[in-house]
């Protein structure tokens, strides 16, 4: 015969009428007994004979006679021989054995076809253990089989099966075996009764499975585990890390077998007496645990705690558990504790989840508990003898205060339902004390000693009593009314209980009541004619200051129209008013009292006494009169959990409960996930509102909670009037025109409707609604009175500063040329989740040139824009890389957009750098070629700026304006040249605008155009910090860059806007402190790259004073100032005062922060060559110092050490003192982050930077002015 060097761990199965007589425990006991019998176990392990017919005199386990008998028996039955499949855990494959061959380590192949009941494989005691332990824990029937030892047999009774070949095994094994017909003759197994099937191992299948079942293998010592079908890794782990045996040898088979036996043996892993595994245990000195196993095991070796027949929780052994302690956790809530027994879990279950109790009438076995103590539990001998849940009695002290509860324990031989001589199980209501006694004297004595003679030390003791009492209320009445008390079954929180006996009785209803404002909850069992909602109503009245007359816990109950069916499950009412006084109280009282008795079907019963009333108000009055003292106590105790105003404090509430089920969690973030996964809905974090999808949730949030945020946010503007605007139906998508061609600034166009975006856009929007639009992003968005009148929102710093620009659909772009679009649905409130879209800027381009002056505010997209439009479009545009720029390097070209820590979009390079180094990507590491990032060169090839032909420049500038301005009118025109006449008109207007720009190059409108185009170019190129302009001619052409590019004019004059940075005026080591953003961030101050070579400090100071004077939206702000060059009127971030007007304006335009440039991309329209005011307004909005600050902050992180002047508040380092002084002048006196221009208090340096960069104070001022003009 073939002998296997390493015995596989395999499954052994018997066929036919296989009768399970062993459990995993008894199997392990086989190992114990075999160890005792074996004279030389190691010899047996390694040297057992492989053939039954061979002489086995050398081995102590097999006589030649039994071997021959076995051989004969198997030979006579060879007609039906079949291959026995065994799984080798060592080789990971199935090994087929002939039924005639027996291996020394694997099995004795005994195939009997007579009734297919004889033992197929027999194996030696040790080997059988080794082979089967692999499957021991995974067998699906292990847990259930362990409890099914039908015959009273000793743990070693089954040793016969594996030691049948030994003559003298009878002396060490009991004669009684699993089958009465099975006996052991002296010659071995020759007399084996083939009509009886004996299962030798823990597998009850008819044939050996082809492969072991997947199971959890877990180390009982350290918790190491894995999921699979091979225990080899577990054995290796245990040997190496717990035994120090690093080399595996063939002689360790016995040790491996014992390791697996210990890990799979329930007694060892769960017994209280099994404190620690040691080497002696592993060597075979195993204790014999005969005590019945009190707990069940699942695949992870958790203790399953049951009470009666109800599975109430688990006990888990974790690495931090010492000794026999475990973490016990309630199945129905988050209650968890560390202890050795589950007594406290049972008491918790009785108090908190009485309605989850399951009692089966046909249960004839005592309930299993998960503690090894003989703690009293209900016992029964006959169906119906079990201590009934309804028999639970509240034990009260002399002063009528509940001190505990008791459940009668029926003797095993007693079938009486309520025997007076029965022992009762008592437990204290305030602690874990419990006892068995025939009277309540012990409980009362304990209460008087430990709990002050009736005064509860627990702050919520009365509440707990109130909660628990509901589960036993009216039990005496129910018992009297029924002929026989029968167990009831509650099906997972459903409130209705029905008797399972043939004796008819009234329905028992159990209802769960939950408070909508806190974690107060309780369960009440009651009859069909009463409802025990009083405690909930009283709770609302006392702890939430809800007037009793406004309490409507059910729309039917106040008038007595409700039925028990209406109260099945959980009561989440009332929809109670939170007002402390209600003007409707008197009428409500009259209404309820008058109609309460007309059709009374259900009464409201007091949970403290037998009083009942069909009227809720009468019941509450009864509580006040009869139970006022106790109510006051409860209120006082509960107030510890609530704020001083009676409302629950968010910080103090430790548990958060689901309103749809019993789920309770301590981490608030886990609750929305629970709603999403379990109930397939979305819950508002501000209230209990749940929505079927994110769209509905966002709509609810915008309509219900945005108002609160508006009130709390202040940006120096007025927030009143928000609530006065009605929110129009969302289906009615009306467009409000902020600037009409007729120069009617404030009129809303209700005729034109916006086409709905594509379905896929909306889907994308819904997916990204919450990620893109956070509450913080629009923290500063607020409505101002003038804006409300004009139906246009005013944006505060955060509204625009933290949101990225987005593009629009062409359909919307068409309408946006006439005016920015605002959906009426969210007009009254800021819509969270929307991003700023360049379309807001583009709306300016469409209008006539004379209409631009008051259009400043409208240029920005409104926060109230429809989420589904704006955000979906923003996402689409962002995907294409258009309309979005990197918040760090200002590039618009990247293979992947990322988000930084502040939620802003950054390019892939900057995002990866900041992720790796936790600091913004500095400028000096950005590879450039002629001032352009190489990264962007991959996206588009550019010629030498000087070599570019006018046509090429026009085309390139057109593309840049399209990206930055979200599509310039010219580009849109080229794309949509076949659009309707209305679109053509808009395009023509924009063309005229741009056409006129060439002639207005030196005018303010032209300057504004220059700003827009240059900023757009800057946006695209992210130029080096060195501000260098090639020549005035080139710069002069720049004004028309974005707009005149449309016409192809002026762009050729200037060449590439990059050139201004290409001049080698700065030293090679000259670089902004940190992030390249800085060069764009501070238009007037804080930008180190405007060197003193270009202008004197006096010019800077004069410019700064002019800047401050023009802050409130001064109309002269953008006008040409005699003392300053054109850059000042344009409010270019880095004006070069000493240069020619044309030259300086160009340079300043290009220096404009990208953010402004993007917003000014609309200014292209503003530059239509219309009135100066027009150009002023857009410019001022765009030029607002905001850009400067935003980027400065980022640079703060990567400032360079060699720079000397640093802002202590923002951490920004400046190259010269003048820039530093300009920056510091932005800080107000009231705080380090107060804006000195509009006195707005920013929360931190990032908020301050964004505020200054975006220049929202200018927006507000201009908006006010526009509003006045409209009026």
UniProtKB/Swiss-Prot annotation:
First and last residues of each zinc finger (GATA-type): 886-910
Compositional bias per record (Basic and acidic residues), positions renumbered to this chain: 54-65, 972-985, 1050-1062, 1170-1196
Ranges annotated as biased composition (Low complexity): 1031-1049
Biased composition (Polar residues): 34-49, 66-76
InterPro entries (UniProt xref): TRPS1 (IPR028440), Znf_C2H2_sf (IPR036236), Znf_C2H2_type (IPR013087), Znf_GATA (IPR000679), Znf_NHR/GATA (IPR013088)
Disulfide cysteine pairs (residue numbers): none
Location of region: Disordered: 1-76, 124-155, 353-387, 843-877, 938-987, 1031-1064, 1154-1196
Glycyl lysine isopeptide (Lys-Gly) (interchain with G-Cter in SUMO) cross-link, renumbered residues: 1182, 1191
GO biological process terms, semicolon-separated: regulation of transcription by RNA polymerase II
Pfam short name (any one): GATA
Cellular component terms per the entry's GO annotation: nucleus
Gene3D superfamilies in UniProt: Classic Zinc Finger, Erythroid Transcription Factor GATA-1, subunit A
UniProt-annotated location(s): Nucleus
Zinc fingers (C2H2-type) by residue: 217-242, 328-353, 426-451, 513-543, 604-627, 656-679, 682-705, 1205-1227, 1233-1257
GO molecular function, one term: DNA-binding transcription factor activity
Taxonomy, superkingdom: Eukaryota
Keyword annotations from UniProtKB, A to Z: DNA-binding, Isopeptide bond, Metal-binding, Nucleus, Repeat, Repressor, Transcription, Transcription regulation, Ubl conjugation, Zinc, Zinc-finger
Assembly behavior: Binds specifically to GATA sequences.
The protein's role, per its UniProt record: Transcriptional repressor. Represses expression of GATA-regulated genes at selected sites and stages in vertebrate development.
Name of this protein: Zinc finger transcription factor Trps1
The species this protein was found in: Xenopus laevis (African clawed frog)
